[in-house]
Amino acid sequence: MKYLKKLFTLLVIALFACGFAACSSDDDEPEEPSLEVTAANLHGTWELAEWNGEPLAEGTYCYIVLNRKDQTFEMYQKFDSMYGRHITGSFAIKNDPYQGYIISGSYDNGMGDWNQSYFVTRLLASGSMIWTAKDDVTDISRYKRCDEVPAEILKECKDLTEE
């Protein structure tokens, strides 16, 4: 009888141990895999959602429309001016075997190259990506995919020559 009590106690302990193991945190949802950074995967309209971990200040915005066919972009932004601006240019993607995917670009109308090249990471099929400045890893931008640039922003950024 004494051995049966010990056996029963061990059996109860074993059942509790199995119960706790079944409730472990290994059931977390798997992380969404990143897509390859190609012009085709970047194609479309992107809104700057966060800059350095913070949402954009009220009244500021940045939308970038990337065209995969000819690797051009149109940017609609309002950061450093009281008016929105429409900026165009071209971009290039390079896959560095040591650093990863890097996007760089140049502006049309002789305005020069982008101030920075950016590491592109966490490009997700669900519609977001991270750009980190190559020469300043504290400069981090999170973009989210959107259907289109809002009409009021297109109107605000319309070139004066188009009116």
Feature map (PLM): residue ranges:
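Sec-dependent bacterial lipoprotein signal peptides
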Residues: 1-22
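Short, solvent-exposed loop/hinge segments that bridge or flank secondary-structure elements
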Residues: 44-71, 104-114
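Beta-sheet ligand-binding and adhesion/scaffold domains
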Residues: 100-163
